[in-house]
A protein has these predicted regions:
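Long, non-transmembrane cytosolic or organellar matrix-exposed soluble domains/tails
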Residues: 257-437
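Start-transfer (signal-anchor) and selected internal transmembrane alpha helices
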Residues: 1-20
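Soluble catalytic regions of membrane-associated enzymes that act on cell-envelope
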Residues: 129-298, 321-322, 326-340
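Aromatic-anchored segments of alpha-helical transmembrane domains
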Residues: 19-24, 111-120
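Transmembrane-helix signature of polytopic, membrane-embedded enzymes
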Residues: 95-114
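Transmembrane-helix motifs of polytopic, lipid-linked glycan transferases
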Residues: 81-99
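Juxtamembrane "helix-exit" motif on the non-cytosolic side of transmembrane helices
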Residues: 26-36, 94-95, 117-125
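Membrane-interface coil-to-helix junctions
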Residues: 23-66, 70-75
Length: 437
């Protein structure tokens, strides 16, 4: 008992460090990512001299030094725990130096660390805005490529923001199940796939740049990334954005611009190895074309300047026409036309693509074509093979609507009806009718 009494301060400090570590690594892991991508610490003398020329610059230097470690979850959490304990121990040391070190004061020395964590690490917007917290979480999950976690979160707690819907559909696309499973999740029209950057919050631009990049819309990905770069406060730089801008210019063959971003990144702790590797082969067309990631992106990128803002379906169609093996772009093209309720185009695209990409036509596409054919061509044979259960469910859905005269009949709001394309179609048509004067 006496030994425990003598050790209680050390045990309390250890428990505090563990608590900070766990908080950062789990509930606040996405927030660490948010901070990391808004700063860029460089290990070179020029950066040090530049930042330390003013008090504000020195503060930014220290904040960026801490934030760089957030790139790796456990390392960032460990640094936060060490800093929190260091501050607490410094305060206790000061109290001892001025001879105010009664044991009952020891727990109070943790208060400054707790307050600093709460007010400096957790932004006010994160504390106040539920939608901002959702956006921060989805952005981190996309960056970390945690597709199953995105889908689990979206299924159990349907997204309240468009950013959440983009990320959900992107996760389905990266798993190769977008056209099979998209209507198991919340959908909100074609904007749930890609959207005009001028209508986005800055945080959403990180994720939408990732989505455009993987599809092959390299120029759009670059525009979104550059928009983030311009919107960062206080002239901050972002390692994530600098890497994306280097990547887009590398894929497009703009080596002079790519080199500029890589030169900055090569003096960073966690982006440096990547930058030095690609600086060494920059300009070597054969090496880049043979690169597993960037060579593949070159084959599926749009050859002409894409205009995502004005005609998404045309851009996606062009991507597929230029590279018929670009399945992600084909998935997005079919999903976009389904969400836009353009069933004639869905049928045309499917007939053109099914031999190369869809020997087994995905579930949602079968549902949309089956219903379209039942309504528009009741006496003609189906243009593609339709599964028996899919056809029966679709026919039953449309029959109930015809009998009740209500597209949103409550009896249809149960599985399997509410997980089909036609449930989305009915809801979308209902919204269109409400919008009409």
């Amino acid at each position: 008992m006496k030994k425990l009494k003598a050790m209680w301060k050390g045990l309390l400090t250890m428990a505090f460090a563990i608590a900070v570590f766990i908080l950062c690594l789990f509930p606040y892991r996405a927030l660490m990512n948010y901070h990391e991508q808004r700063h860029l610490f460089r290990w070179d003398s020029y950066y040090f001299q530049e930042q330390c020329a003013s008090l504000d610059g020195l503060c930014e230097y220290l904040i960026s030094w801490i934030a760089q470690f957030f790139y790796i979850g456990w390392l960032g959490a460990a640094v936060m725990a060490l800093l929190a304990v260091a501050l607490q121990q410094a305060i206790w040391t000061i109290l001892k130096l001025i001879r105010i070190h009664r044991s009952w004061l020891y727990p109070l020395t943790f208060i400054p660390s707790i307050l600093l964590f709460y007010y400096a690490f957790i932004p006010q917007e994160y504390k106040d805005d539920r939608l901002f917290r959702e956006a921060v979480t989805y952005d981190y999950l996309v960056r970390a490529q945690k597709w199953n976690k995105i889908l689990g979160k979206s299924y159990n707690h349907p997204p309240e923001t468009m950013n959440g819907i983009w990320c959900t559909n992107f996760a389905l696309g990266m798993r190769g199940t977008l056209l099979d499973d998209m209507f198991f999740y919340k959908q909100d029209g074609p904007d749930g796939l890609l959207m005009d950057a001028t209508r986005m919050q800055p945080l959403a631009l990180y994720s939408i740049s990732d989505i455009a990049f993987e599809i092959g819309m390299i120029n759009s990905a670059e525009r979104f990334a550059f928009d983030v770069k311009q919107r960062l406060p206080n002239n901050h730089k972002s390692g994530r954005i600098y890497q994306r801008l280097a990547e887009t210019n590398l894929v497009n063959g703009h080596y002079k611009i790519a080199r500029k971003y890589m030169h900055v990144l090569q003096s960073t702790l966690f982006y440096g190895r990547w930058a030095r590797h690609y600086l060494a082969i920059l300009g070597d067309e054969q090496a880049i074309n043979n690169d597993a990631r960037y060579g593949a992106l070159r084959t599926r990128r749009q050859q002409s300047n894409d205009q995502l803002i004005y005609a998404q379906d045309q851009v996606l169609a062009q991507l597929v026409a230029e590279n018929p093996k670009n399945k992600l772009a084909a998935d997005y093209l079919l999903a976009y036309t389904m969400l836009r309720l353009d069933l004639e185009s869905v049928t045309e695209h499917t007939l053109r693509l099914k031999d190369n990409l869809y020997p087994n036509v995905p579930k949602s596409v079968q549902e949309s074509i089956a219903g379209y054919w039942i309504m528009k061509h009741p006496n003609d044979s189906l243009p593609i093979p339709i599964g028996k259960s899919i056809y029966q469910t679709t026919a039953s859905y449309l029959s109930i609507i015809n009998q009740s005269g209500n597209m949103l009949d409550p009896s249809l709001d149960v599985p399997p009806y509410n997980q089909s394309y036609w449930h989305y179609h009915a809801q979308a048509m209902g919204k269109l009718k409400q919008q009409r004067p």
